[in-house]
């Protein structure tokens, strides 16, 4: 009798073990996405939107929670995901697309290797714009060059378009901006412009045109776009020249044009979601595949369109390849990037 009970117990344990082995890894679990900016900015809004449609695309239908960890232009969040979070595919990060700048120039705060993040995907690629309050006395590049007092631009941190786009313009066109960093996110930077504390800021075209207060500001004429980074003019700002047009007009040297291409490659990273290095390959595949399905969900596409967002997803595989490409640059490029980033 005891043998039968023991055999039955063994069979039951093996059966349970087999069921557990067959159950999807993410079943009954919670994925946490750490957003490196404060609530209300473009990265935060995109991440929260994706998080609503992503779980049902992941085998096991896990919960997804979003946590804000602002600071250092997402440096704090990036370091946390890379070096503190377990590489189990349960903690991800939504970080700034240009953090590779900081690694290239050797900032001591960097505790990650850009190429070794687990790249999951991005819901969009971005083009940068630089916009001003309409009552600011700067209508052209020449106005900025001749100004007795440089324009005051709000910025979050060096890895954000709020900072690197005006700094690139300084380097390429010989301009001067008074860039004030430290804003936790785009919402706080916008508030400073609304109050008149700041006169300008860099932004992605999608966040500027696709959410408030940008949409209302454009409609009411409160702001104007001075310059944009896309290869062609955005139809929503047809009067604003592109950086490429201006470089052609001003006969910018080829070395500066190459620098612009490297810096503006950050736009391809878009709104990247990453994991720690060392996530098991099967979980990487699950996360990448499900992410691309989530951003292709008809309901998500409809929501993005309603919000005025430019849905242009980038796969984790493409982000991984781009990360390896941008991180290897010649010494002269790195020296100029140090000037851009103030090191």
Predicted regions and their residues:
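Short beta-strand->loop
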Residues: 113-123, 176-182, 213-266, 315, ...
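Hinge/capping helix and adjacent helix->loop/strand transition within the periplasmic-binding protein
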Residues: 56-61, 80-91, 99-188, 192-197, ...
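Bacterial N-terminal signal peptides
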Residues: 6-17
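Extracytoplasmic "Venus flytrap"
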Residues: 33-48, 70-73, 154-161
